[in-house]
Swiss-Prot record:
Keywords: Cytoplasm, Repeat, Transferase
Compartmental location: Cytoplasm
Recorded domain comment: Contains two rhodanese domains with different primary structures but with near identical secondary structure conformations suggesting a common evolutionary origin. Only the C-terminal rhodanese domain contains the catalytic cysteine residue.
Main EC class the enzyme belongs to: transferase
Reactions catalysed: thiosulfate + hydrogen cyanide = thiocyanate + sulfite + 2 H(+)
Active-site residues annotated for this sequence: 239
One GO cellular component, as annotated: cytoplasm
Pfam family, one: Rhodanese
Alphabetical list of CDD domains matching this protein: TST_Repeat_1, TST_Repeat_2
Name by which UniProt lists this protein: Thiosulfate sulfurtransferase
Amino acid sequence: MDYAKDVLVSTEWAAQNLQTPGVRFIEVDEDILLYETGHLPGAVKLDWQTDLWHPVERDFIEPQQVSELLGKLGIKADDTIVLYGDKSNWWASYAYWFLTYSGVSNLKIMNGGRQKWVAEGREMTTEAPTVTATTYPALQRDESLRAYRDEVRAHLESVNNGQGAMVDVRSPDEFSGKVTHMPNYPQEGVLRGGHIPGARNIPWAKATNEDGTFKSADELKALYEGEGVTADKDVIAYCRIAERSSHSWFVLRELLGYPKVRNYDGSWTEWGNGVGLPIEKTYSEE
């Protein structure tokens, strides 16, 4: 079977379209300094820490600010935006989800991301592109793509009766409650470990190949259906701060075409600190 939507481009396609009018490349990395060490010619940088988040509240910038951001990057409304980055496109997927949620269309991801481009020895530059600012039109959020804490809590009933599914895309040790964060990552202040009751643990990396590309549609379908996460269910995905769950959201909604998939961006850093929220913990030190 083919992917449900035409949302991926190959590194070869990207190399052939670096100078194509109406095609714009945006790099989004976990390591926000990586872009300066070399990037695709013509690509602009999106900093997930400063560009997408509200400077004070734990929330995103408003749609008007998204329009201003894209305008500052020289993006036009009818441009095809190709996102790519490090970590098998973690943060490129996060930006894809956020921009889709904000009402932006014509989005694609470069399959394999930065690591595949570099591994193939393709052209890189440290030169920042010259950008002519544009006026990007007004945007409207699609709230059907985002899950909030109270919605997640209400969703537990749907999970229990088999109409909904909850996907925890973190590592097995995070899921069990043995640890509250990934190895070699800072502790982000989560007071409790474990997972949301009823969640299925399907680590994000199971959807990728060693070169950072996504697995085939047939493999992805078997992966999720094998855990009872089927297209007829209302699905919510979460991780720690929503970058890994954005990757899984992209797989489920864009590559497999599941109609109802939401990303819980509060994820474990909200749920694990929430007073009175139910938690399952399967790890025991005994």
